[in-house]
Amino acid sequence: MERIISAKNPVIPGRGVCDPHIHNFDEKLYLYASHDAIPYTRNFCMHDWQIWSSSNAVEWTLESVVHPEEFFMGPSNNCWAVDAAKRNGRYYFYFSDGNNRIGVAVADNPGGPFKDALGKPMLDGTLTKTTEYDPAVFEDDDGEYYLVFGGPEWCYGEGCGYYIARLNEDMISFAETPRKITLDHCGDDKASLNKFGGKYYLSYGGFYAVSDSVYGPYHFIGHTASTIDHSSFCEWNGQIFQAITVKEQEYYRSSGLCYVHIKENGELITDPLIVEYGVGQYDSNWNRIEAEWYMKGVNVRKKENRCLFGFLVACTEKAVLTYPKLHNLSDKTGFSLDYYCVGGKAVIEVRTGGENGPLLGMIKAEHPTDSYEWYCRRNDFFRFDTKLDDTSDVVLVLRPEKGTELCIDSFHFIREPDSEK
């Protein structure tokens, strides 16, 4: 199997792996993608689809190349966007035949091989008034699955837009007639549907709208500022990830990943630095590493930092934050942490390698005597006793006592002038 180790976004550079729909299947990330076949062209040429997987979001393995010849389509240049789902131990692959039809294939493994489930389109362009392409599949909390598809009225004419329908348990037929989604925005194609904090998020090209019902109506909120093309979201290891399109060229695109944070008002926030450099690895030369950029979080929640800006990572019991592949550590001599401690005392352990790895240092925190929330913010630091390897996983083990909320804001590594000698 082909493997690629990414240094930054895009995660699979120079290969035309685009229109990413990302899923957490069996505690592993799977990227279901279209494939721009030819660089330096002035139109889309897409001969197949690709499925990539990763256990750390940095090292990616090509699971399979899916060819339209294996389905009802036959040879094609129009292998447009795809999505996938898991139900009852089987995996379902929904694919676009250009902007005209949608098919479905099934496999016993998330990486395939996939077999055409119907031998004909699931949507042949006649069931609704919209253009039936760009499928997005969504699993709700009650175990029901829905398919969203369609292109915008401003492009394809009256009656077009997003449509949604609940799927039967077989995942290859509809349990109801697709209905049009009401959206107070112009919309697009390239839909994705997720649920965060009890709200349904319909997203498209970085834009997103929110509803209390899976069927809508959806109220436009804003843009993630991470991409203007296909994207999708998934939750994994206590973190929210967005798979984004990175435009290396207009018709030869790539895919990247970034973290996503949700404000109290429902806005989705991304970080420009992470949009550029990607997830799962960090540079100790950065001025600060935000706590919410963790790759894995146990017993934590993100909350808005009302005193300053951005987000905090909060816990009220033992918690663990993991920041793997921290680079350029060999010339660093110390560690500095910004945090809040409210209600009592806490201990923050900084370790390498894992939760039980070597201890770099420890910070003892306690609720300050100041009466204003602003002054609950503290900074503390310590010097390393040993020289660090140049690349290492760094883990924060948080131990608040009962009745204490510990919030981590950010941290950075110290490089003293003497280390340059």
Task: Tell where the protein language model's regions lie, with residue ranges.
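Carbohydrate-active catalytic/glycan-binding domains of CAZyme proteins
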Residues: 1-421
